[in-house]
Amino acid sequence: MGKTLSRLRLFEAAVALSGGAAFVMVLLLREALAAFPGVLVIGTLALFLAPGVLLARWFLDEHFSGAALAPAGFVISAGGFALLAVPVLIAQASLEVYLWAAGVAVAVSLLAAALAALTGRRFAGQAAEKGVERDVAERGGVMWVPFLALVGVLAYVAKITAPSSYGDIWVYLAWVRGYLGGGGLASVEPFFGGEVGLSRARINGWLVEQAAFARVSGVDLVDGVFSYLNPFFVVVALLTFYSLARVLLKSERAALFCGCLYALFFLVHLGQTRFTFGGEFVQRLPEDKLATKFFFLPMALAFAAAFIEGGKWRYFSCFACVCCAVVAVHPIGFATIGLSMAGFGILHLASNPRSRTAWARVLAMGLAGLLIVAVPAALVPAITGQPLTDVLADSDINSGDPDVLRNMVFVSPERARIFEFADGSYIMHPSLLLDPIIAVAYMLGIPFLLWRVQRSVAAQLLFGTMFLTTVAVYVPPVATFLGDNVVLPGQIWRLAWPIPLATLLAFGWLLWETGRWVTAHLSGVRLLSVLSRALPSLVVVVLAVLAAPWVSDGLEPIREHRESSRAAGFYPVDPIYPWFRDEIESPTVVLASDLLGARIPAYSSEANVVSRRGSLVLNVLPRVQERAPGRIEIPQGAVDVREFFAGTSIRTGVEILRRHEVDYVMVTANSPLDAALDSLSGFKPVEEPSERYVLYRVNLQKIGTPASAKSPNTPE
């Protein structure tokens, strides 16, 4: 008892002391530690994690102890701080208001930790009873070595990966930069400077959390996200999967074994393109929708399984809070959780049809989900006169014209997101189930789970998730109904996110049980018995060796992209982008090509652009117009940008500049357009540090006449 009490006090004392030290670092020693940004990042993350880790320690210790404490604490903190941001966003208050509220929450948590350390008080989740965690007889042991090695490899790849030069991440970072620029949160659209109406941005707490991270740590937003948060999120995602496996399989070794297979899956599928499993994993975790896929979905399933099996209402409370919080991150996360839980609930009730306890627990979770979606579903139509799904689609952070958003997925076959039939119905593209690893794991996992589904909560969760999600996205009438009435067609492929999660976990479980069967039959032979105990680790090592050629092939384009991005000034970025951040102090319009302009608002909250990745629409515009005749709004800014930089007459160019009230034009140095602008009046080169690009200050009153006609004394 004394040892347990001492251990409890030491943990809370460590949290309180580390939190206090972190407060000192970020508040008092920031300038002194500016040369060591990693230290400031660690301090900021310590403050961020403190509330969630303490709550998980105090109330969830039966299932989430040891390494599982970290991802549980992360999801609780991330969800809590996201919900905290919602009223601030709706009120369009400043980031400082949010920071004060978050700071109070952290300070209260640290004070509670200090009091618990001094008094030795126990909480419900720490009661000295034989809980599920005590039933975990198989500790990780040597299995931690390959797991941590694979986690380290993926984190390293995430660290060295250069972001997509044209990806969604730059849109998100533009919003975050706007929050850092002052003023009301979600009050101004970051690309064009317009007002923000009823939009998903008004409830997106994930972006506010990233703004708070940048402000508290003092690290530049872009560098902080790509150099620190991205590899950190990779580690958390793998630990989250481990935590889910640990809850379901009740074995630390089995969970680590499954975690190794999960990590190897991403390593085998590495690639620079973000449309591969591995490329997505190492590049896109800072995006809100990917956070729901890799953090909130598996942790919600873990909380649900713990509640269904043990019946303790604190796990139900965590499940309900995660479901509520995920809406403040990205609504698609709520849809994937709901779909998974529907399958789980149906199978659990089918396996226990006469159990009042089973009915009560499943109905409680279902009611929680219905209440979470019912409130906005009732209020939004009353306020706007439109269904909730239409409002979210019309104002998606990444979208412009909602009709374009609805049809883009059908005209981008290279992304393998959807498969359309001749009658107009559609399903998710079969590429997911045609992946060799997923296909084998799915076909072997289904009969394995069916054999156990009657008596195992884990089998019920995994099989229910796999089966119902497959029906939802691969049965044409069902998928078409969901795409037309519940989510957009372009969201159908995201509804399938639970399939690889559950399939890989089921396959890992199958291999683990196979290994146990082999071990049991070899236990009578001394030498073979010793080898059999190391069998899981040996299997992982063998699979890693076999995967090495695929990993090497996947790393090659990642390295090539990093070097090409460095050479082109995409990442690390050309010095002109930090110049925008440091020198532009009032609202400004910059005319730049789509490729160059995509990053400008991510560096400057005052710099707006003429087009927001408009070439993506223009490239498929004829096909989109064919699908929705008369309903597509042609993005004028995108048309003007393409025409200006493709070569146009002086008159047309002047019209474009005046139409958008352009203040600066950004062109490639020594290009024909650079020479042309230099020969015209009204364009004055700006002194900036870039050698790749030239920035011209535009005088709209004088543009269009030859420079030779200017008086030498004419001011610009």
Feature map (PLM): residue ranges:
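Active-site lumenal/periplasmic loops and adjacent helix-entry segments of GT-C-fold
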Residues: 142, 146-296, 307, 332, ...
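Hydrophobic/aromatic-rich transmembrane helices and adjacent perimembrane loops
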Residues: 44, 231-234, 289-296, 335, ...
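Membrane-helix boundary/interfacial segments in multi-pass membrane proteins
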Residues: 33-43, 91-99, 164-165, 272-292, ...
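Membrane-embedded, hydrophobic transmembrane alpha-helices
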Residues: 1-137, 477-484, 491, 505
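Membrane-interface helix-loop-helix junctions at transmembrane boundaries of multi-pass membrane enzymes
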Residues: 136-139, 252-257, 311-313, 352-364, ...
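Extracytoplasmic
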Residues: 546-716
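Hydrophobic, aromatic-rich transmembrane alpha-helices
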Residues: 245, 345-352, 435-459, 506-517
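Transmembrane alpha-helical segments
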Residues: 155, 268, 329, 333, ...
